[in-house]
């Protein structure tokens, strides 16, 4: 276990108000005076704090006799944090993620002694650059790697210890209002030399492995970024449009979330909701029958098929829109998907509506054989009539991943083709190309930015602008808001 000296951006008053914690919540060593003993695995490492005025000074004497700065941390063992809030008050926070223990001590006497002696000890060793360098590296180097770990642990166990779901959210979407955000000391010291530190690597690896190990156990609390492996609090992830708060990576969105993002509230009118596949070629599978697999995805996603189609308003402009869902059999295009998209385009043709297709697919569905390949021609034929004969406007939005038959048909037929940042866009996947051609595919050659520079599509639009850009395009082409 590692120990850290932290400053907290959450005051004692806020902590008590949000989490319903009293000034002394059964802290380490039971300083609250409660008769009920507190037991945890760290008692052997945490020295006696019992009694308001009877602290053992043997610990303080030991602090003064340390041979190295590293041993200072033995005074605060396990997951115990010395915290100073924005008001300058000090307290300790202890949490044990395995045994589900969360304790806070707000007694300022001992912590004041600890802080004073800690500062005195550093002053005594101020002549040694090695000691200061070790301390600087130990305290400052790991702010980024431990930020999410501390936030998620404290946030989770405040809820579990107080049985209050409402203590997390106060009506604000700002994550800094909902987490206990901690940072290592002050901003002015962040520029300290870190190049030769071995601690940075070891602690960063420890934090990353801890996140990975706990991802399954606490998967209901967070979403892990597939790019940087940072943790994003699940409760607020949808409000952040599934964008990683750490690196800005655009993670996959469900079709329902995309409809909520693009369509004005109260204007969504779905089409052909109950159209389902009937296994037209009676596909044989030794593992799971095709119909059973369809049923399992329907239960898992709540959708009838891999695409949702309908009409609605985008910033007041009536549109027809189809949104593919990669969670439903990889967004594969079967006969039902092709039929729903074709009907949507024909409906928009008859009513002179602009069309948006949001693509997220692995390609044609192999369980339907040549019938799935026919959908490419059928949709393309409907689009030809829509674009060439009726002179209407079609916008294609390519998200990650867009591959196979979708890329080879309606995905690349838009009058304007928009891509999301870092979207995986290709006809054949990297593994298929390498196995077929026996050649290595260069890293990054199938992401949106690479294809953009080759002229494959038009703009790359971040998700937070994805509603505004099509709206401006529609108005430029003569489609305006209607009451």
From Swiss-Prot:
GO terms for cellular component: acetyl-CoA carboxylase complex; chloroplast stroma. InterPro entries: AcCoA_carboxyl_beta, Acetyl_CoA_COase_Trfase_b_su, ClpP/crotonase-like_dom_sf, COA_CT_N. Keywords: ATP-binding, Chloroplast, Fatty acid biosynthesis, Fatty acid metabolism, Lipid biosynthesis, Lipid metabolism, Metal-binding, Nucleotide-binding, Plastid, Transferase, Zinc, Zinc-finger. Its cofactor is Zn(2+). Residues 221-483 form the CoA carboxyltransferase N-terminal domain. One of its GO terms (biological process) is fatty acid biosynthetic process. Pathway: Lipid metabolism; malonyl-CoA biosynthesis; malonyl-CoA from acetyl-CoA: step 1/1. Pfam families: Carboxyl_trans. Binds 1 zinc ion per subunit. Zn(2+) binds at residues 225, 228, 244, 247. A zinc finger (C4-type) spans 225-247. Component of the acetyl coenzyme A carboxylase (ACC) complex. Biotin carboxylase (BC) catalyzes the carboxylation of biotin on its carrier protein (BCCP) and then the CO(2) group is transferred by the transcarboxylase to acetyl-CoA to form malonyl-CoA. Acetyl-CoA carboxylase is a heterohexamer composed of biotin carboxyl carrier protein, biotin carboxylase and 2 subunits each of ACCase subunit alpha and ACCase plastid-coded subunit beta (accD). This is Acetyl-coenzyme A carboxylase carboxyl transferase subunit beta, chloroplastic.
